[in-house]
């Protein structure tokens, strides 16, 4: 199910996974799916699009926005297949446009069932990635309704994550 808004279908908790085009995000989705099955939780996938910066080129901006939305939908389909393979259930899919930490915070505030945020950490020497770094340095970004953050190291194997998920 894809939407711009969260839906509350039942009273189970939800694990929020940020879906972006990097291997560590896929590992986070894998782990969240496994944990959801063990915890009787649901998974919600969030893809965040950066708004185009062509203010006076409205046609170009709309074309770019449509292409980005199509790419996000395709990415969410891939992530959804992974989550369903692990949890046995279709995840909820949400696409938002804006600044990543702001959109994450808004979605958490809007959907009281979201209980844990799953992020993948990069294996690059430059650090775990901008989103993980932002939230580690300023957890107040999620202060309106703080929730635990599970950071899945990109260097872990799926077998290691299977053992951890139970």
Q: What are these model-predicted stretches?
A:
Residues 1-5, 84-117, 156-159, 163-166:
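Structural beta-alpha unit
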Residues 6-59, 144-145, 153:
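Small/aliphatic-rich secondary-structure junction motif
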Residues 28, 55-58, 105-106, 129-130, ...:
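Short, well-ordered secondary-structure micro-motifs
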Residues 44-46, 92-96, 150-152:
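General small-molecule cofactor/ligand-binding pocket signal
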Residues 47-73, 159-166:
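Acidic, proline/glycine-rich short linear motifs
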Residues 72-80:
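N-terminal membrane-insertion helices
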Residues 116-143, 159-162:
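Glycine-rich, Arg-bearing micro-motifs that act as flexible, cationic patches
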Residues 119-120, 148-154:
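Short beta-strand elements of ligand-binding domains
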């Amino acid at each position: 199910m894809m939407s711009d808004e969260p839906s509350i279908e039942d009273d189970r908790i939800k694990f929020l996974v940020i879906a972006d085009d990097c291997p560590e995000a896929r590992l986070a989705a894998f782990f969240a799916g496994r944990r959801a099955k063990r915890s009787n939780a649901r998974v919600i996938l969030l893809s965040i699009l950066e708004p185009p910066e062509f203010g006076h080129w409205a046609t170009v901006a709309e074309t770019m926005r449509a292409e980005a939305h199509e790419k996000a939908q395709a990415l969410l389909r891939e992530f959804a297949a992974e989550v369903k393979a692990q949890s046995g259930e279709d995840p909820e899919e949400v696409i938002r446009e804006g600044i990543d930490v702001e959109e994450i915070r808004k979605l958490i505030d809007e959907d009281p069932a979201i209980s844990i945020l799953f992020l993948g950490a990069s294996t690059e020497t430059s650090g775990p990635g901008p989103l993980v770094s932002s939230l580690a340095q300023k957890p107040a970004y999620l202060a309106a309704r703080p929730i635990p953050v599970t950071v899945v190291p990109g260097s872990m194997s799926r077998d290691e994550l299977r053992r951890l998920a139970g």
